[in-house]
Swiss-Prot record:
The gene is Tpcn1. Intracellular channel initially characterized as a non-selective Ca(2+)-permeable channel activated by NAADP (nicotinic acid adenine dinucleotide phosphate), it is also a voltage-gated highly-selective Na(+) channel activated directly by PI(3,5)P2 (phosphatidylinositol 3,5-bisphosphate) that senses pH changes and confers electrical excitability to organelles. Localizes to the early and recycling endosomes membranes where it plays a role in the uptake and processing of proteins and regulates organellar membrane excitability, membrane trafficking and pH homeostasis. This is Two pore calcium channel protein 1. It comes from Mus musculus (Mouse). It comes from the Eukaryota. Disruption phenotype: TPCN1 and TPCN2 double knockouts are viable, fertile, have no obvious morphological abnormalities, and no obvious behavioral defects. After fasting for 3 days, they are less active and endurance performance is reduced by 8.3 fold in contrast to wild-type littermates that show no changes. Two days after re-introduction of food, mutants regain endurance and become as active as before fasting.
């Protein structure tokens, strides 16, 4: 098998002999010992880890090198399971399961999952009721659906082969997916046989295929947090509905005697209109009939909105926010301890019989070939040195606990010179040195802030002076040329003073470069009268964002916003999955119901009215336009659901559908509002939690520490480099590894250096911030976790090595979960 070329999928079954030969034991750079029986399963914090090789009581049935290769691979699997938060009971139990595991955990399989799920979702564009231009014959879309479902069957078969039947049926999400698959399969066959579509509400369940994809892990986490937040949410929601019903009964008795008040004529109307009033969509319309009869009736509505909208709704957000904080902290704790357990298992597999107290470099290198296949030999050695805080030949378990953080570093040689222009002739050096001092000075930075502020005011004044949308001037404004020239000079001065590499390493500099480049393109569009590209000119105000760097609070807001973007994307996708499910249900029940003049007998008839009449010689059309908000196809349904999410006049759509169907249709719209309210509340709570967390961390840390990433500096001596190079030459390492090591050696010899310094960099993650925020509690978590492992061992939850097993199999992995 060829080596995988992606760090996200580091696990491979065998190594390509032409590219990466195994590194069996030798006497160089950390002499290798025989792996301990059953995969070196020493008691590491009271946890024993079986291996993929033979049982504990039987001698290894394969060469020592093969035993170590299997240990390296299984240790890498444990690390991957810890990183992905995969439960250890899904660990492959034999060679057959291992092959399936490796097939399931690669990007080809992930892409197959994703594309199949997208195909099933996109079929709703072609199935009845279809988008007119995309409509397909029943035979075609049913065949495509069966093909996609067969691919899902293949995916589940591979997971069954990996997990085994007992574990497969214990996996709840997989069983839900299997159940939906069976229902979808039966329906697709029925449609294909009948050659016509029927009511298929179960299509709303297709989202499970997308949610189960590896690439949609963020969506699964969001759904899990939504379900975890439901208990307190439901408590407050029941309180809200309780007060709503009390006020509905009170309103019915107070206002039903008014014949001109349609809002409280029945108890059902009272409940529905007070529910709509909670969203303020029908206020003050709902109050006016009773208010016209008795001005004191406004007290009823004021008290209702004060309790329901301003107190209970905000209480709902507060409760969800508090629950969300607890969930985030518990999630961090669980993942931290899960990773710690995975590291303990991996360490046990890498410890040898003769040296159980640590991991030699050779063992570590064998692990990294499976865990990080794209990592070069030089980077592996630097990673080993960065982990080895005790500066001993062996890597202790305490050092190995940092494997996840250190393995993510990107290593580059530290430049010997401070600036890019240090080796230039003296005259040029002095010029560029002066430019460097200038662009790094506070005066230069504040001058540019002043220019940006003046530019913003100028753009605002120009915009106020424009009339009738006539902003496509035939002439280039002189102010445009002046400010663009200043920005261009700033750009060239920074590139000259800092150097291209250092300049482009800053996110703000990249932003400045992008905005300046767009401004230049806008100048070309104006000069050449390229009307289709005039929109580029509108991007000029983006320069004003640079002013956010002036104030620390603004920087925190922007940093939080950028940190939230990936998570917000997953939250948006989560909301879209709910949209899809409700859109399918809406199409099945309300398709073709909303048409022009459809609701003439309802209270919202004007919103759906379409009248064509002639006044003199002109034909006048009066349209209510709300008939466009329908469920005739999936695209219209998404637009309609978004309008319902905004809640402005959403009751008009609800009443229009109700007038054409039944009063029970209101349950669909009310349920959708409650579901979107849950998701939106979670989104708001997430934003609040992230911002508060960032602000609290900023108070505890230096500002520069927050803004900068993580940097580790390590020195590699010439002797160490020669030893690593000799190791790879003797053991027939990959040609690329040897070449890179030789390049490093030649660079040392060129500059007559005995050592070279390397910098390992990575961005600071939420996990890093959490480690510092909770550092006082983390040690208590570790001690509690160790006690739990000890208790589980005493209770016999971690059995001893199994009896002799056939070659190629191993005992079930018993781990602490």
């Amino acid at each position: 098998m060829a080596v995988s070329l992606d760090d996200d999928v580091p696990l491979i079954l065998t190594l390509d002999e032409a590219e990466s030969a195994p590194l069996p034991p030798s006497n160089s750079l950390g002499q290798e010992q025989l792996p301990s029986k059953n995969g070196g399963s020493h008691s590491i914090h009271n946890s024993q880890v079986p291996s993929l090789v033979s049982g504990a009581d039987s001698p290894p049935s394969s060469p020592t090198g093969h035993n170590w290769e299997m240990n390296y691979q299984e240790a890498a699997i444990y690390l991957q399971e810890g990183q992905n938060n995969d439960k250890f009971f899904t660990h492959p139990k034999d060679a057959r399961a291992l092959a399936a595991y490796l097939f399931v955990h690669n990007h080809f399989f992930y892409m197959m999952e994703l594309l199949t799920a997208l195909l099933l979702l996109l079929l709703s564009l072609c199935e009845s009721p279809a988008v007119p231009v995309l409509k397909l014959h029943t035979y075609v879309h049913a065949t495509l659906e069966l093909f996609a479902l067969m691919v899902v069957v293949f995916e589940l078969c591979m997971k069954l082969r990996w997990l085994g039947f007992h574990t497969f049926v214990r996996h709840k999400r997989t069983m839900v997916k299997t159940s939906v698959l069976v229902v979808q399969f039966i329906e697709a066959i029925v449609v294909l046989v009948r050659q016509t579509s029927h009511v298929r509400v179960t299509r709303a369940l297709r989202c499970i295929f997308l949610v189960d994809c590896r690439y949609c892990g963020g969506v699964r986490r969001n759904l899990r947090q939504i379900f975890q937040s439901l208990p307190p949410f439901m408590d407050i929601l029941l309180l809200l509905l309780f007060f709503m019903i009390i006020f509905a009964i009170l309103g019915f008795y107070l206002f039903s005697t008014n014949p001109s008040d349609p809002y409280f004529s029945t108890l059902e109307n009272s409940i529905v209109n007070l529910f709509v009033l909670l969203t303020t969509a029908n206020f003050p319309d709902v109050m006016m009939p009773s208010y016209s009869r008795n001005p004191w009736s406004c007290v009823f509505f004021i008290v209702y909105l004060s309790i329901e909208l301003y107190f209970i709704m905000n209480l709902l957000l507060a409760v969800v926010f508090d629950t969300f904080n607890d969930i985030e902290k518990h999630k961090f704790k669980s993942l931290l301890l899960h990773k710690r357990t995975a590291i303990q298992h991996a360490y046990g597999l890498l410890a040898s019989q003769r040296r159980p107290a640590g991991i030699s470099y050779r063992q570590f290198e064998g692990l990294m070939r499976f865990y990080k296949p794209r990592m070069s030999a030089r980077e592996r050695f630097l990673t080993f040195k960065a982990l080895n805080q005790s500066n001993t030949p062996l890597l202790s378990l305490k050092d190995f606990y940092d494997i996840y953080e250190v393995a993510a570093l990107q290593w580059k040689a530290k430049r010997n010179r401070q600036h890019w222009f240090d080796e230039l002739p003296r005259t040029a050096f002095l010029i560029f040195k002066g430019i460097n001092i200038l662009v790094n000075s506070k005066a230069f930075q504040y001058f540019m802030y002043l220019v940006v502020a003046v530019n913003g005011v100028w753009i605002l004044v120009e915009t106020f002076m424009l009339k009738g949308g006539n902003f496509t001037s035939k002439h280039v404004p002189w102010s445009y040329l002046v400010f663009l020239t200043i920005y261009g000079v700033e750009l060239f001065m920074k590139v000259a003073g800092l150097g291209p590499v250092e300049y482009l390493s800053s996110g703000w500099n990249l932003f400045d470069f992008s905005v300046t480049a767009f401004a230049f393109l806008g100048l070309l569009a104006l000069t050449l009268n390229m009307e289709p590209f005039y929109f580029i000119v509108v991007l000029r105000p983006l320069q004003l964002l640079r002013l956010f760097k002036l104030k620390k609070r603004y920087r925190n807001v922007l940093d939080t916003m950028f940190e939230l973007l990936p998570r917000m994307a997953s939250l948006g996708l989560t909301l879209l999955t709910f949209y899809y499910s409700f859109a399918i249900v809406g199409m099945e029940f309300f398709n073709g119901r909303l048409t022009p003049n459809c609701c003439n007998t309802s209270t919202v008839a004007d919103a759906y009215r379409f009248i064509n009449h002639t006044v003199g010689n002109k034909t006048k059309v009066e349209e209510g336009y709300y008939y466009l908000n329908n469920f005739d196809n999936i695209l219209n349904s998404f637009v309609t659901l978004f309008e319902l999410t905004v809640v402005n006049n959403w009751y008009i759509i609800m009443e229009g559908v109700t007038s054409q169907t039944s009063h029970w249709s209101r349950l669909y719209f009310m349920t959708f509002y409650i579901v979107t309210m849950v998701v939106m509340t979670i989104i708001v709570a997430f934003i609040l939690e992230a911002f508060v967390f960032r602000m609290n961390y900023s108070r505890k840390s230096q500002d520069s520490e927050v803004d900068s990433g993580i940097v580790i500096e390590k020195e590699m001596s010439k002797e160490e480099l020669m030893a690593v190079l000799e190791l790879y030459r003797e053991e027939r390492g990959t040609s690329s590894d040897v070449t890179r090591l030789l390049d490093t050696l030649s660079q040392m010899e060129k500059y007559q250096q005995n050592s070279m310094v390397f910098l390992g960099r990575r961005s600071r993650t939420k996990s890093d911030l959490s480690l510092k925020m909770y550092q006082e509690e983390i040690q208590e978590w570790y001690e509690e976790h160790a006690r739990e492992q000890e208790q589980q061992k005493l209770r016999g939850s971690v059995p001893g090595p199994a009896a002799q097993q056939p070659p190629g199999s191993r005992q079930r992995s018993q781990t602490v979960t």
